[in-house]
Every structure is written in C-alpha cells, then in structure tokens.
C-alpha cells in the first residue's frame, strides 16, 4: 500500500507563479481578444468597436486603481461600480484577461510534457471524427456499457480548492472566487437561460469546469492502469479541454484519498474503454456485470469522498451493449446484430448456417436536428420549413450561399451516418426554407419563384455531397454513389458548432 501511495503523489509543479500582476498588463487583453488564439470560441461585441483597444484597458485599470470595486459592503452591494452599471463590460474584460492568465501554469506544464516526450505539438491533434473508427473497431467486441453524466460541484469553493494544487497565487484564487460567487448559478445550471456574462466569458468557465474534469480523470486513469497488467495505450480524446486532444500513453500519477486505498485491489479489468464527451462519459467493458458494478461503486465513492459531490448510485445504469443506444457527438450510436443465412450443400445434405455479426451503427437523430433548425427559424416545431425574415435584406446570391454553407457543413459532419434518411429530411427543410425566403423577399409565391429559378437551383443542393466526394475519390458515378451511401468519417473536423453559429 505504501508503494501505491508513492505512485499517487501528483507531479504538480511546486513553483509559485505570481499571476495576479499580469492582470494589469495590456498585452494580456490583446491575447484574450486574438481570434487566432480563440478560433473555437466566438466573441460577442460588448458595445465597443475595437475589442483590443488599449485605451479601454487603460481606463479600466485606472478605475481599478482609483476605486476598490472588489470590496463589497451592504451599502453599495447593489450599485457597486464593478458589478453595477457597467457590470457586463467591466466583468467581461477582466474575466477574459484573467482566463488567459490562469491558464499559464497549465499551458507550461502541457508544453513541458510534450518536450520531455519529444512529441511535436501538431502530432498531438486529433479530429473529432477520429474517435468513431476507434469505436467501430473496439465496441463490437465489448459486452456492457455505462453512460454517466459527470456531476457538478455543489459549491464553487470545492473547485477553487482543487485549483490550489496548480495555481499558487492567492490573489488570483481570490479573484476567481469573486467571479464564481457572482455567476455560479448560471454555471452549474445548464438549462438556465445563459446570461450575457456567461456567453461572453466561455473561456473562463470552461477552464474552471475542465480543471475539475482533469482532476477526476487523473485519479480515474491511475486506478485503471493499476487494475490491469496492460498499459493504457489507446488514444483518448477530451473534447472539452482548453488543450483539446491528449494521448494517454504513459503511466498516470494521481493524488488519491485515503478513503479508497482499501478497494484498489478490486479492479482487474483487462479490457475496458473510457470516453468523455460534453459533460458525460461512458465506460464499456467485456467482463461480467459484477465488475461493472464494482466500478460503479468506485465512481460514487470517488465523487462523494474526494470531490464532496453527492451522486446517487441509481443514476449509473449498466446496460448490455447490443440492446442499448447512446447519444454521442450528434449521433445515436449502438451495436446491432446483423444475421446472414448461408446455404451450404455437401453431397446430398443441405445446410443452412445462420451467422450473426455485430456492427457499430451511427444514426442521425432527427428530433434534435429539427430542434436546432427551429431555434434558428428555419422551420416550426413540426419541422415545416419557414422563411428567414432576417435575411430578406441580403442579396439573392448571399442568401443561397448561406443556406448552401449550412447544408454543406451538416452533410460533411453527418457523412458517417449508417442511415441518411434523417439527413435527407434536414436538407429538404433547408432547401425549401431558402426558397421561401427568396420568394418572400421578391413578394412572390413559392411555386412561381421555383419556376423562375429552374432546375439549376435544386442541383446546387443535390450535388453538394458529390462535389466533396470528388476530392477524395475518382470522379466516377458508381464510386461516388457508393461512397455517398456508405459511411465516411472526415478527419478534418476539430470543433462542433450549433446551426446558429453558421449564421
């Protein structure tokens, strides 16, 4: 047990980074607003034209020197200068700069790890679609799966205490407490209406949430490696990280609480896979339900004792993989048994051999897609196409190009679907919504406008996939048609955007 405890000491840096003084450096805010560094996170205009203007930063810093807005009192808690009249602007600017600063210890540790292993940073990137071929190869041989929602902290102070292992600057931690205290409810309530602050400060809250996920996964992966004689060499993709894609090919060391030392020997699973995605994770194994129940008990104890998060064991279901479907990255995935009957004749005897083969299927769920189209005003709640009044002022070519771009992105991302019937319906909604928008702009009926456009307009939507396929396959009709009906995983997709982001 002492040997285990030696492995469990985290290799955290003991250096004391003085991060708080960087908050008063203008270049930090320029980095925060650099779209080249934040391509995946869009920035909403906060009411000023030049987002990187040093004048605004100087005024903010001067105001912070002249006043002490971070101190709350009963008298001015409502009309505080910091969270008062200019609450959105000032808090957004500060939190964006603070998000860049607090990531410094993590980024240094990440780059040092790559240099120590002589791994080029570019080789560590993985497409979102790269996980699906992995699932197709591995999940057909597994038997049980558990799909779990990762619980949130009940209090922000627990999250701050976790960060103390990495960030040694007390002033920075106090400022983080300030942001979390003010906006904690919007962070831990996903269904709640997203406030202006939350939309404009996604990077800070992603950092706070990912630090919790990182701490949990360090412990989880340590126990996984301890439970098996086989090293964890599979590629693990963490979609919610600030540095998104990580390879797990080394022995993970983690801090471990004394409450779990007695159950380390329980887990001897030689064939288990773990995938985390969008606030959830699932573990799949080839072993018996008894072992899966032991992992279930471990997870509940881990969250309750180490992270002080109450989690009911009944929320972790153990299902047979061949009878269970789970939603994963815009797909509904499952393992199905495909039966094939082979007729064999030997001399005068005739045999019928029934072969059952497992196949990993990925289907596009139509209801979530129609919900996204409805939120973006492409259709009503029943999926009937409607016009887009916000695009009437644009030119005809601009309107058509926007609809084609959305259609192309959807076709590109969902090209790996086993059945494309749902995708055809979505394309039909977009095509008819585009026609209705153009007809409304020119004050004509849909039928009249379709006759005016002719067949060339419809061909733009119908031939979009074949144009993409021609880049990766010979331009023959049979090959293009066969690939279009089959599954294609494009390995150049590194982010997922809602339909509204394509507007």
Curated annotation (Swiss-Prot):
Q: Where, subcellularly, is it found?
A: Plastid, Chloroplast
TM region positions: none
Chief localisation class: plastid
MF terms (GO), sorted A to Z? RNA binding
Xref: Pfam families: Intron_maturas2, MatK_N
Give the record's GO CC terms: chloroplast
Keyword match Chloroplast = yes
Q: Is tRNA processing there in the keyword field?
A: yes
Coiled-coil regions in this chain? Answer: none
Q: Name one GO biological process term.
A: mRNA processing
Q: What are the record keywords, sorted?
A: Chloroplast, mRNA processing, Plastid, RNA-binding, tRNA processing
Described purpose of this protein according to its UniProt entry: Usually encoded in the trnK tRNA gene intron. Probably assists in splicing its own and other chloroplast group II introns.
Task: Give the family, as the similarity comment puts it.
Answer: Belongs to the intron maturase 2 family. MatK subfamily.
In Swiss-Prot or TrEMBL terms, this protein is called Maturase K
What lineage is on file?
A: Eukaryota, Viridiplantae, Streptophyta, Embryophyta, Tracheophyta
Q: Which gene encodes it?
A: matK
């Amino acid at each position: 047990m002492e040997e285990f405890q030696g492995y469990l000491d985290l290799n955290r840096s003991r250096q004391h980074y003085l991060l708080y003084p960087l908050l008063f450096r203008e270049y930090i805010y320029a980095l925060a607003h650099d779209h080249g560094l934040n391509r995946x996170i869009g920035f909403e205009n906060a009411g000023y034209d030049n987002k990187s203007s040093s004048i605004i930063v100087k005024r903010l810093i001067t105001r912070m020197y002249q006043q002490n807005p971070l101190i709350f009192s009963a008298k001015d808690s409502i009309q505080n200068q910091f969270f008062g009249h200019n609450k959105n602007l000032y808090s957004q600017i500060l939190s964006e700069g603070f998000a860049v600063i607090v990531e410094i210890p993590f980024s240094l540790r990440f780059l040092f790890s790559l240099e120590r292993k002589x791994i080029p940073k570019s080789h560590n990137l993985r497409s979102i679609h790269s996980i699906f071929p992995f699932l197709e190869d591995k999940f057909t041989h597994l038997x049980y799966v558990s799909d779990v929602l990762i619980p949130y902290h009940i209090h922000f102070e627990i999250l701050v205490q976790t960060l103390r292992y990495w960030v040694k600057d007390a002033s920075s931690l106090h400022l983080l407490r300030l942001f979390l205290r003010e906006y904690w409810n919007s962070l831990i309530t996903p269904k709640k209406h997203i406030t202006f602050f939350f939309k404009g400060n996604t990077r800070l809250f992603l950092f706070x949430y990912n630090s919790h996920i990182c701490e949990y996964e360090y412990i989880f992966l340590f126990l996984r490696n301890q439970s098996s004689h086989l090293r964890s060499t599979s590629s693990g993709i963490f979609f919610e990280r600030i540095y998104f894609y990580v390879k797990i090919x080394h022995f993970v060391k983690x801090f471990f609480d004394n409450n779990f030392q007695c159950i380390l020997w329980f887990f001897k699973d030689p064939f288990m896979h773990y995938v985390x995605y969008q606030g959830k994770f699932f573990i799949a194994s080839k072993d018996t339900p008894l072992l899966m129940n032991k992992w279930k008990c471990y997870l509940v104890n881990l969250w309750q004792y180490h992270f002080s998060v109450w989690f009911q064991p009944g929320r972790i279901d153990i299902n047979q993989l061949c009878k269970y479907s789970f939603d994963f990255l815009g797909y509904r995935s499952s393992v199905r048994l495909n039966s094939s009957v082979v007729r064999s004749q030997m001399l005068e005897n005739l045999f019928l051999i029934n072969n059952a083969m497992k196949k990993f299927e990925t289907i596009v769920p139509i209801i979530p897609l129609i919900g996204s189209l409805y939120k973006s005003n492409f259709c009503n709640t029943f999926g009937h196409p409607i016009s887009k009044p916000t695009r009437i002022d644009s030119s005809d070519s601009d309107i058509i190009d926007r609809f084609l771009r959305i259609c192309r992105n959807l076709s590109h991302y969902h090209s790996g679907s086993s059945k494309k019937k749902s995708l055809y319906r979505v394309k039909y909604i977009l095509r008819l919504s585009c026609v209705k928008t153009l007809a409304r702009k020119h004050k004509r009926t849909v039928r009249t406008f379709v006759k005016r456009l002719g067949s060339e307009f419809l061909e733009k939507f119908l031939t979009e996939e074949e144009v993409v396929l021609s880049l990766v396959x010979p331009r023959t009709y049979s090959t293009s048609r066969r690939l279009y009906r089959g599954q294609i995983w494009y390995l150049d997709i590194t982010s997922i955007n809602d339909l509204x982001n394509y507007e």
